[in-house]
Amino acid sequence: MSRVYNFSAGPAAIPEEVLFTVRDELLDWHGIGMSIAEVSHRGEEFIGVAEEAERDLRELLAVPESYHILFLQGGSRLQFAMVPMNLLANHKKAVYIDSGVWSNLAIREAKNYCDPHLATNAKELNYTGIPDQATWDMPNEAAYFYYVDNETVNGIEFPFIPDTHLTLVCDMSSNLLSRPFDVSRYGLIFACAQKNMGLAGLTIVIVHDDLLKRSPLPTTPSYLQYALHAKERSFINTPPTFAWYLAGLIFKWVKNQGGVAVLAERNQRKAAKLYKFIDKSNFFDNPINPTYRSRMNVIFRLADERLNSLFLKEATENGLANLKGHRLLGGMRASIYNAMTEEGVDALINFMGQFEKRHG
């Protein structure tokens, strides 16, 4: 069997060690004669899996006991609506940063429920960075302050936590578990699983208990209420059990790697060496302000875009898969989440160097 280096933005690469465990356990999980995918979500087997996954994630991120961790369905995009539905309360305004594609979609969704106030707009910089925080327009009152920590399409990542007195809400779909951060600075964090935590179909929400006391908008369906999910411990109905199980295996893998801090150092090395190569090249280019360059999603363009198809074809032939950029931006994108090895990044750099020699 020959596996390729998978640079997909999501669903993304899963650590091989985790895949081997899934393979070994798939038909007979822990000697019960069934797959974990077949057991009842309310049986002791899966309840144990679910509780252990939550404990491990809480430990990895140092999540205080004053926060609930929810394992939900619907993908992160559903959170674009659930956040205002549950957190607006009596407010008419919420603060957003437009930093790229995913924050822009969240803002558009929020307009169905409130007046989203833009603190700043990276469009002014052609989405190559974030305007200086000293220039942000911050109201004194609003229901919450929302931003996307890492924009997968635009290749922008926040190197800091925004300074605000408002309740901080963050979409960490593409970089949760990639570096340590202070959970207590946030009111709510959410992340879909298919970047750093396994399979599409699972979204993790970390929410402070105080926010669960806010009254949802009257039109909010009961199934979309955080408080009800918290009360039922994410078991209102059948959860995505296999995705939850796989996320738990990945949490174990992160612990075995040495924890989030160790992965953060590795992620920094991977990104730094790829950006260093691109910056030295006269053939490849990355337009993002170095301060805001994503460690997870490295976008780049070829000097001659007529060679794009050839680049992708030869990359695939060399075991480097899914490097095509997002349809909205074009170009190339190497997504180097936690599961991408340093060897994979080295292989990409070597291929890019050889391609430049032949076509530059």
UniProtKB/Swiss-Prot annotation:
GO terms for molecular function: O-phospho-L-serine:2-oxoglutarate aminotransferase activity; pyridoxal phosphate binding. One of its GO terms (cellular component) is cytoplasm. It catalyses: O-phospho-L-serine + 2-oxoglutarate = 3-phosphooxypyruvate + L-glutamate; 4-(phosphooxy)-L-threonine + 2-oxoglutarate = (R)-3-hydroxy-2-oxo-4-phosphooxybutanoate + L-glutamate. Pyridoxal 5'-phosphate binds at residues 102, 152, 171, 194, 237-238. Keywords: Amino-acid biosynthesis, Aminotransferase, Cytoplasm, Pyridoxal phosphate, Pyridoxine biosynthesis, Serine biosynthesis, Transferase. The keyword Amino-acid biosynthesis applies. Its EC number is 2.6.1.52. Pfam families: Aminotran_5. L-glutamate binds at residue 42. Pathway: Amino-acid biosynthesis; L-serine biosynthesis; L-serine from 3-phospho-D-glycerate: step 2/3; Cofactor biosynthesis; pyridoxine 5'-phosphate biosynthesis; pyridoxine 5'-phosphate from D-erythrose 4-phosphate: step 3/5. Coiled coil: none annotated. InterPro entries: Aminotrans_V_dom, Aminotrans_V_PyrdxlP_BS, Pser_aminoTfrase, PyrdxlP-dep_Trfase, PyrdxlP-dep_Trfase_major, PyrdxlP-dep_Trfase_small. GO terms for biological process: L-serine biosynthetic process; pyridoxine biosynthetic process. The modification N6-(pyridoxal phosphate)lysine is found at residue 195. Binds 1 pyridoxal phosphate per subunit. PROSITE patterns: AA_TRANSFER_CLASS_5. It is found in: Cytoplasm. PANTHER family: PHOSPHOSERINE AMINOTRANSFERASE. Belongs to the class-V pyridoxal-phosphate-dependent aminotransferase family. SerC subfamily. Catalyzes the reversible conversion of 3-phosphohydroxypyruvate to phosphoserine and of 3-hydroxy-2-oxo-4-phosphonooxybutanoate to phosphohydroxythreonine. Homodimer. This is Phosphoserine aminotransferase. It comes from Coxiella burnetii (strain CbuK_Q154) (Coxiella burnetii (strain Q154)).
